[in-house]
Amino acid sequence: MFSLFYGLWKYLFSKMELHVLILGIDKAGKTTLLEKMKSVYSNIEGIPPDRIIPTVGLNIGRIEVANSKLVFWDLGGQPGLRSIWEKYYEEAHAVIFVVDASCPSRFEDAKSALEKVLRHEDLQGAPLLILANKQDIPEAVSADELARYLDLKKLDERVSMFEAVSAYDGMGIRESAEWLVEVMERS
């Protein structure tokens, strides 16, 4: 009898745990984004941006948004580390792809990496949030400009959104996370 009530209690009151990959080429601001999300959704200050070093392997972060627990897997974006990304695809409920919107010379590399991610069968149907990061830098292109440049044909059948954010000052972070939770809870 206890297990029946426990199961019912757990069903009614526990939060759904969702796994989100944070991907992008090196220096896009993935770890800064993760640290800013942690500080926005908790009372704990994340690592200051000037103390963040390039990710070699994986950083894990956890936050609670609405009725969900989000577990973020922030993976290193250097060319030699991108081969490990696919080891995390099968368990991912969504993907955040971060692009440094202030550095157009790296858009082609970002587009190539993103297209490879989108082709993988384990991520078919996973919601995709593409972030035009570093909006605090005057030279950054808008989310619409980035979307036109990336010109991703495969997005037609996928739930996706482009959003302009600044992982440095937090602009757009809360809206992005709330959109992601909403679409993951529906799928």
Regions found by a protein language model. Give the residues of each.
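TRAFAC-class small GTPase G-domain
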Residues: 1-187
